[in-house]
Amino acid sequence: NIGHSGADVVIVLNDNERSYAPTVSMLGNSLVKLRANRTFRKNEEKLARFMEEIPLIGKQVVKGVGSAKTAVREYFEPTSFFEDLGITYLGPFDGHDLKAVERALKTAKGLKGPTLVHVLTQKGKGYGPAVNDPIKNMHDIGAVKEGSFTQIFSDTLKEIMTENENVYAITAAMPDSTGLLPIQDEFKDRVIDVGIAEQHAVTFATGLAMGGKLPVVAVYSTFLTRAVDQVVYDAALHKQKVIFCLDRAGITGTDGPSHNGVFDMALFTSVPGITILAPASGKELAFMLKEATKSEIEGPIIIRWPKTAPSQLVPFFDGDISQSQCVNESKDSQVLLLGVGSIVPNCIDAMEKLRTEGITAECWNVRSVKPIDPRLIERILEVKNVVTVEDGIISGGFGQNLAAQLGTKSNVMIKVLGVADQFLEHADVDSLQQKVGINADGIASTVKETLK
């Protein structure tokens, strides 16, 4: 669009040969070729500065020689990728040489039409720990922690891929953070990094599924929102079994407002034929992933888990992955607490708090966000008072879908807890859960209000 418009726009390409991870694409290869001109550009700049200093005629000489050099260069070199798009290309320049960058920007500003200034930089330059980090150049300080959901996913997927050569793992430029890096070397042809291209990752995975393979897409919850169209119209519409493993689902806290994975349930529960699973423990994640690869489920399967460490509070349940789990069945329950995924431990804590106040609550681990377990519906119709708790946007989420499924004739009092109509600010997970009322105290308080 910019090239077609001819607008006077200056684009700065900060080229450090990386994105989140090493760059993967033919565009990246094109930049490699452009970087090869670096020595020529340096000598060119020195010559220009020398000629510019010639008294009286310096600037005219530079202008004339510049035109000649351009003609010679275009004769011997093909046009750059950007020039084919109608964008004037300048560079590459040393991005750490401020004077060189300033000269380049001034030159670009004086040109008509869109101009791209290509600067070469080193990611993490000047900071030893970043420069010496071979994986991400300290893009962030996070890492896959021992015993985390991500580590459990990585170990389980390695086991699955060892047993089943039809399983492929796909990442969009995040092999380290999603847990695929430890298994990438062992399965070089089956762990595929498509670059920062989530839409392509989903369509590519769908193509693999159509070809008889079993693709597992490892992606942060917040980044799958970029590929909603592909999930719906490529994978789901064609009933292709693609397993989407959503790390950082729910409230991530200190990752910032853009990284809270609170929209996935609301976005995908409305999609026909999709299955959404939310493990409440690390052991349950491993179980669900194995069962998902073996099951006869038709269509996409989403498994979502949080950044926070797995809880040991939730007893393991090896029932079918479509079934919900009653954590503490009670015949005289006054209220049902229905927790989704990582929120189940909060519900268990709330249940204990309520018990000390003489209120009997029955806690359920939902497990299957979609489809909803018919056994759970039956129990709801018996108890009548229900509080659902999820770490996602309320609108369109599990609780609202449950209420819609129950309808207006069920005479059930249902209260839905989750993230209201807002973007959450940067803060720790505990503070944000308290703010939206899905910590143990908030849940207990809501139950007492419901029973009044």
Protein language model annotation of sequence segments:
Residues 278-296:
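Conserved glycine-bearing catalytic or ligand-binding loops at nucleotide- and phosphate-handling centers
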Residues 1, 179, 191, 198-218, ...:
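Extended, hydrophobic alpha-helical segments in both membrane/secreted and soluble proteins
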Residues 104, 230, 288-289, 375:
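Short beta-alpha junctions and helix-cap segments that line functional grooves
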Residues 93, 276-279:
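Short acidic-hydrophobic, aromatic-tinged amphipathic segments that line or gate anion-handling sites
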Residues 4-137, 142-186, 193, 199-203, ...:
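Thiamine diphosphate
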